[in-house]
Amino acid sequence: MDDKQHTSSSDDERAEIATSNQDQETNSSKRVHLKRWQFISILIGTTLITAVITVVAYIFINQKISGLNKTDQANLNKIENVYKILNSDYYKKQDSDKLSKAAIDGMVKELKDPYSEYLTKEQTKSFNEGVSGDFVGIGAEMQKKNDQIMVTSPMKGSPAERAGIRPKDVITKVNGKSIKGKALDEVVKDVRGKENTEVTLTVQRGSEEKDVKIKREKIHVKSVDYKKKGKVGVITINKFQNDTSGELKDAVLKAHKDGLKKIVLDLRNNPGGLLDEAVKMANIFIDKGKTVVKLEKGKDTEAIQTSNDSLKEAKDMDISILVNEGSASASEVFTGALKDYNKAKVYGSKTFGKGVVQTTREFKDGSLLKYTEMKWLTPDGHYIHGKGIKPDVTIDTPKYQSLNVIPNTKTFKVGDDDKNIKTIKIGLSALGYKVDNESTQFDQALENQVKAFQQANKLEVTGEFNKETNNKFTELLVEKANKHDDVLDKLINILK
């Protein structure tokens, strides 16, 4: 084995202090957290990187590799013998790599732990890209909309921008091959590749279609965004990756330069990431020598403390942290520390509640094992696993911003009884249509509103909630979410 790391993160296209399964948990039913790009990402598949944000935590418990006892050795010998027998004597030829992976997967599955998993070499690569925030590609954010792959925006200074790619460009081919019917992640995989190699995109812009050659480069995706909203500085932290602490420090300094005294740290739908980054970020606001998080394994505990003086420009700032049920892991470590030291007031809704830390061990073949090794507590000793952190002031998320994705493989009509019908009603109500109940029944009144929706959006008027209606419904909810961040607006009004 090569590196041993402790992770506190989530997963591919997700991650946090624990594992790459965090998003799968918070979105087990594909729950939509309507927070700007996050909402788009979940609802219509916007993706810039397929990131497994893992956490490199602290190795604090000195472990000695001891010899196996007789029982363990016997079990290991048995596994080895079964592998050899099946690999050599089974009547059909077996793939030795698949047998090995199946054995490992079986052991991990037996843990019944959603945060422990074995990653292949390819999965490990994605996982590490999530940790670093770096990947090789063209730097264009894409989304799937109405069965088309569309560029949302090229990153500033990226190869895509330099090549002339524009927002709303529709990609029809990659390297001369049609992408019709392909999933968004498949297209992203095709667009990516080795550094300094070229990819040719066939782009449709209006009635014009042309080929654009773009050289792939290493792209860094920033995890922090700063905006000035009146007299309040809003710093959005999307994940905890390499140098998120540096990005946060820069954002705080910009806010100070702008003369702002009130800062909102927006951690909504932040699944976590690197634990050491969470500690460094807390150190911006918490003085030297203070405990940020306590790690515990059995009877062994260690307090991880700040190592530097806090940022002087942040000392007089009024800090507010905005969280929701999608804020997990490293987000909770950071929030818990600032809350315990009264350095920030917490707003929003209760956080996810992930209080365990994973360790990663990477093997020589590039694969990786991630497993839960310890739990963590806040400085005051609060164990938030399964409980979350309650905000000091609750700001409820509008119902339409927490909808489950409606599968577009099914059509709903009068007489149907389905949980997705409640989602349809909530969404239509948010879009201004008259809905008098939120039951799971598709009644005549709902049919009338669906017809009105279809007519207003120039769709075939059937009264049935079909694929085309669903796509437009989703698109309009996304637009509404992007135009109106109700929760953030409420918080800014509170802070005025």
Curated annotation (Swiss-Prot):
EC assignment: 3.4.21.-
Annotated GO biological process: proteolysis; signal transduction
A GO CC term attached to the entry: plasma membrane
Family annotation (PROSITE patterns): PDZ (PS50106)
Active site per the UniProt annotation: S329, D340, K354
GO-annotated molecular function: endopeptidase activity; serine-type peptidase activity
Name recorded for this polypeptide: Probable CtpA-like serine protease
